[in-house]
Amino acid sequence: MDFYRALSDYYDEIFPLKGPQKTFLQDYIRRESLTSVLDIGCGTGTFAIETSNTGVRVLGVDLSEEMVEISNKKAKKIGSTASFSLADMRDLSRINEEFDGVFCLGNTLAHVSGDIELKEVLTQFGKKGTHLLLQTVNYDRILAKQVKELPMIKTAHLTFYRHYTFRPDGLLDFNMKIEFMDSREVVSGTNLLYPIKVDRLKKTLLETGWEVSGQWGNFDKDAWTEESPATVLAARRIPR
């Protein structure tokens, strides 16, 4: 089995929606009075479908055809109003609508190639919405402690392994492996990531017309520290 097909098929089992994520999204949507959301890097549509359950109009986009296919099937099966289409966060020109909010969660943003592309992507986000919610791995912690391995995830059917390789150019090779319990089949893949530290992210947000309105270390809304597992930032577009 191809690694990315396997990851798509078992994504919801590996990364199920948790209570704090659900509560955070509901609170954020209510606080910012959002009526429409563009979910960039939507994966299998978990956040998009959950957001649509609050009555918000949602379009989820992803670079993976497999993810979009699964998202559409999930939405149809449960009668969700969320819609999904194929798009790359680096080029959102085919999306003609504007939205109240733009979500870029699940470490999607770290797939930019560096500072220049980060600036280009955040500028594009500002053309699609007035409120922005970002979530990445806390790369301040990863870089400071030279973390080479993330916690192993075990489910009823598989074990998911994740390792970092630190590259001389400052990027990270994110090495992933899925081992299936029954068949003992092993599939693996590698993604290239740009480890965005929080100060760099906040500086680039300001440079691209965004003002940070909230910062947390997880979806429980704990204060962000260098030890936090994640970086969660909310921002509002600065009026021109």
Language-model segments: residues:
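SAM-dependent methyltransferase
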Residues: 133-204
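Conserved class I S-adenosyl-L-methionine
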Residues: 1-32, 34-43
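A short glycine-rich, Lys/Arg-flanked "PGG" loop and its adjoining helix->strand segment in the class I
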Residues: 117-131
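C-terminal lobe and adjacent flexible extensions of AdoMet/dcAdoMet transferase-like proteins
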Residues: 200-240
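Short conserved loop adjoining the S-adenosyl-L-methionine
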Residues: 91-97
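Class I SAM-dependent methyltransferase SAM/SAH-binding core
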Residues: 45-91
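A short SAM/SAH-binding and catalytic strip from SAM-dependent methyltransferases
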Residues: 100-116
